[in-house]
From Swiss-Prot:
InterPro entries assigned: CPSF6/7, CPSF6_RRM, Nucleotide-bd_a/b_plait_sf, RBD_domain_sf, RRM_dom
A biological process term (GO) from this entry: positive regulation of RNA export from nucleus
Annotated positions of the Phosphoserine modification: 494, 500, 511, 513, 525
Self-association and partners: Component of the cleavage factor Im (CFIm) complex.
Compositional bias annotation for Basic and acidic residues: 389-404, 489-503, 515-551
PROSITE patterns given in the database record: RRM (PS50102)
Described function: Component of the cleavage factor Im (CFIm) complex that functions as an activator of the pre-mRNA 3'-end cleavage and polyadenylation processing required for the maturation of pre-mRNA into functional mRNAs. CFIm contributes to the recruitment of multiprotein complexes on specific sequences on the pre-mRNA 3'-end, so called cleavage and polyadenylation signals (pA signals). Most pre-mRNAs contain multiple pA signals, resulting in alternative cleavage and polyadenylation (APA) producing mRNAs with variable 3'-end formation.
Protein name, per record: Cleavage and polyadenylation specificity factor subunit 6
Nucleus keyword on record: yes
Keywords, alphabetical: Cytoplasm, mRNA processing, Nucleus, Phosphoprotein
Length: 551
C-alpha cells in the first residue's frame, strides 16, 4: 500500500478526505489510468505534460483560487474517469469548456488538459477531461454533443489510444488544409462567449484585457459563424469599435475607475477610440476596420514598441490614413501582410498564459518594453529555450566512438591491437585456404570478409601496416572468388548439360566481350601512338623549316 499512501499525499491539496481501504484499496484504477494517460504524456505535445500526473490536482486547486472561474464543487470519491472532448475550435479555453460542462449539471470535474501543437503551442482542438463519477461521464457523453460550443458540437469519447489517434489525425488534417488553402486559421468570435468572464489573463491565444481596442482578432469568421460583438459594450474598460469610418468619441469611464495602461505601449487617450490595425488571422488584402485617427499606434508583434506618446495637439489633428505609421524597429514586409499563422498568442509583454498553454512559446512580461526580433527572420539557435540534449548512454550516436578512436593511443596499446590484427589476418587466410581446398568456397569467403571488417573497425585501421594486412586479405578473397566461379561452372557442366551449355555460351560471350574490350583499348593505344608519331614528325618538320629559313 505504499503507492496508495503516495497518492493520498498527492491528492491532499484537493481538500477532500476519503477512506483508503474502502474506496482506494486496489491499484487497478490507478494502473489503468496511468496506462491510458501515458501515450498522451509521451506524445510530445508540451514539455509540462510529462509530469502532469503529479501536479494536476494541486494545479486545479490553484487555478480555482487565482482566476475568476466559476465555483467548482468537488465531489471526489477516489474514482477517476477520463474522457476525450474533441471537435473544438483552437481558441476554446478551459473556462468555456468548464461552463459548458457545468450547464449540464456536472460539477465533479477533476482536470481539464488541452492537447497542443509543439510548434506553436496552439490547441489541437481536443482536450482530456477527468470526472469523478460514472454518472457524470454518461451525462457528458449523452448531453454535451447536443450543446453548441463556438458554433461546433463537441464530440465526447472514452479515453483510449484509438480515439486519441483519431483526434490527432483530425488535427493534422485541419492544420494541413488550413495551410494549403492559404487563408490561415479563422480568428475567434468577437467575445460573446468570453464577455461573461472578467479579463483574467487566462485563455488560449487571447490578448490581455488591459490593452484597449476591442477584439484583437478582427479576422474572418471561423466554423462558429461570423464574429458578433453583442456583449462587448458590457466591458467598461474597452470603448466600442465602430464601423469603418471616423467613429465618434466614446464617453469617459465611470467615476473612480482608471483605465489600466497597456503593457507594451503608452496609455490610450480617453478622447479618441483605439486605432485599428491588422492582426494575425486577418486575410491578406482586407481593408482595415477604419481610418487611423491621430494618436500612438498600437504595438504590432515583430515590429518593436511604438515610439512614445505624441505631444499635446493644440491645432487640428493630422489627416487620418489607412495605415498606421511604421514605428522604429527592424524592417520587414508592410503592415498589411498578416504574420505567419504559426505565431499565435499574446504580443510581447502579455501576462503569462493559461496552465494548459506551454509557457515556453511566450516571452516573459519583464521584457515588455524591449523590442522583439522580427518574427520573419531566421530563428535563433533554440527558439523555444529547450535544455541541451541529455546523455543517452549506450544508445547515443556513433560520434562518441569516432571521438574515442581519434584519441591518441599509447605505444603498448598500438602494438597490442596490431598484433591482434596480424593474428586475425593470418588465421583467416589459413582457414580460408583450407576451406577453399576442401571446396567450401562460401565459408572461405565469409571468413575473409569478416576478418577484413574486423581489421577496418579497429582503432589502428588508418595505419599503413594495417592497410597492408587488409590488402593481403582482399587479394586472397579475390583469388578464392575467381576460383569459386570457375569450379561452380565445372560442377554445373558435370551435372546438367543444358545449363552447362548456357553457361559456356555466356562465358564465351564474356570472353569475346573482354577480347573486344582489350582489342578496343589496344587499338586506342595504337591510335595514340600514331598521333604522337605524327606530332613528332610535324615538330621535326617545323624545326627543319626554321633552320632552313635562318640559313
Amino acid at each position: 500500500m505504499a503507492d496508495g499512501v503516495d497518492h493520498i499525499d498527492i491528492y491532499a491539496d484537493v481538500g477532500e478526505e476519503f477512506n483508503q481501504e474502502a474506496e482506494y484499496g486496489g491499484h487497478d484504477q490507478i494502473d489503468l489510468y496511468d496506462d491510458v494517460i501515458s501515450p498522451s504524456a509521451n506524445n510530445g505535445d508540451a514539455p509540462e505534460d510529462r509530469d502532469y500526473m503529479d501536479s494536476l490536482p494541486p494545479s486545479v486547486g490553484d487555478d480555482v483560487g487565482k482566476g475568476a472561474a466559476p465555483n467548482v464543487v468537488y465531489t471526489y470519491t477516489g474514482k477517476r474517469i477520463a474522457l476525450y472532448i474533441g471537435n473544438l475550435t483552437w481558441w476554446t479555453t478551459d473556462e468555456d469548456l468548464t461552463e459548458a460542462v457545468h450547464s449540464l449539471g456536472v460539477n465533479d470535474i477533476l482536470e481539464i488538459k488541452f492537447f497542443e501543437n509543439r510548434a506553436n503551442g496552439q490547441s489541437k482542438g481536443f482536450a482530456l477531461v477527468g470526472v469523478g463519477s460514472e454518472a457524470s461521464s454518461k451525462k457528458l457523453m449523452d448531453l454535451l454533443p447536443k450543446r453548441e460550443l463556438h458554433g461546433q458540437n463537441p464530440v465526447v469519447t472514452p479515453c483510449n489510444k484509438q480515439f486519441l489517434s483519431q483526434f490527432e489525425m483530425q488535427s493534422r488534417k485541419t492544420t494541413q488544409s488550413g495551410q494549403m488553402s492559404g487563408e490561415g486559421k479563422a480568428g475567434p468570435p468577437g467575445g460573446s462567449s468570453r464577455a461573461a468572464f472578467p479579463p483574467s489573463n487566462r485563455g488560449r491565444g487571447r490578448f490581455p484585457g488591459a490593452i484597449p481596442g476591442g477584439d484583437r482578432f478582427p479576422g474572418p469568421a471561423g466554423p462558429g459563424g461570423p464574429p458578433h460583438r453583442s456583449q462587448l459594450d458590457k466591458l467598461p474598460t474597452r470603448p466600442p469599435l465602430g464601423p469603418p469610418g471616423p467613429p465618434g468619441p466614446p464617453g469617459p469611464p465611470p467615476p473612480g475607475q482608471v483605465l489600466p495602461p497597456p503593457l507594451a505601449g503608452p496609455p490610450n487617450r480617453g478622447d479618441r477610440p483605439p486605432p485599428p490595425v491588422l492582426f494575425p488571422g486577418q486575410p491578406f488584402g482586407q481593408p482595415p476596420l477604419g481610418p487611423l485617427p491621430p494618436g500612438p499606434p498600437p504595438p504590432v508583434p515583430g515590429y518593436g514598441p511604438p515610439p512614445g506618446p505624441p505631444p499635446p495637439q493644440q491645432g487640428p489633428p493630422p489627416p487620418p490614413g489607412p495605415f498606421p505609421p511604421r514605428p522604429p524597429g527592424p524592417l520587414g514586409p508592410p503592415l498589411t501582410l498578416a504574420p505567419p499563422p504559426h505565431l499565435p498568442g499574446p504580443p510581447p509583454g502579455a501576462p503569462p498564459p493559461a496552465p494548459h498553454v506551454n509557457p515556453a512559446f511566450f516571452p516573459p512580461p519583464a521584457n515588455s518594453g524591449i523590442p522583439t526580433s522580427d518574427s520573419r527572420g531566421p530563428p535563433p539557435t533554440d527558439p523555444y529555450g529547450r535544455p541541451p540534449p541529455y546523455d543517452r548512454g549506450d544508445y547515443g550516436p556513433p560520434g562518441r566512438e569516432m571521438d574515442a578512436a581519434r584519441t591518441p593511443l599509447s605505444e603498448a596499446e598500438f602494438e597490442e591491437i596490431m598484433n591482434r590484427n596480424r593474428a586475425i589476418s593470418s588465421s583467416a587466410i589459413s582457414r580460408a585456404v583450407s576451406d577453399a581446398s576442401a571446396g567450401d568456397y562460401g565459408s572461405a569467403i565469409e571468413t575473409l570478409v569478416t576478418a577484413i571488417s574486423l581489421i577496418k573497425q579497429s582503432k589502428v585501421s588508418a595505419d599503413d601496416r594495417c592497410k597492408v594486412l587488409i590488402s593481403s586479405l582482399q587479394d586472397c578473397l579475390h583469388g578464392i572468388e575467381s576460383k569459386s566461379y570457375g569450379s561452380g561452372s565445372r560442377r554445373e557442366r558435370s551435372r546438367e548439360r543444358d545449363h552447362s551449355r548456357s553457361r559456356e555460351k555466356s562465358r564465351r560471350h564474356k570472353s569475346r566481350s573482354r577480347d573486344r574490350h582489350d582489342d578496343y583499348y589496344r587499338e586506342r593505344s595504337r591510335e595514340r601512338e600514331r598521333h604522337r608519331d605524327r606530332d613528332r614528325d610535324r615538330d621535326r618538320e617545323r624545326d627543319r623549316e626554321r633552320e632552313y629559313r635562318h640559313r
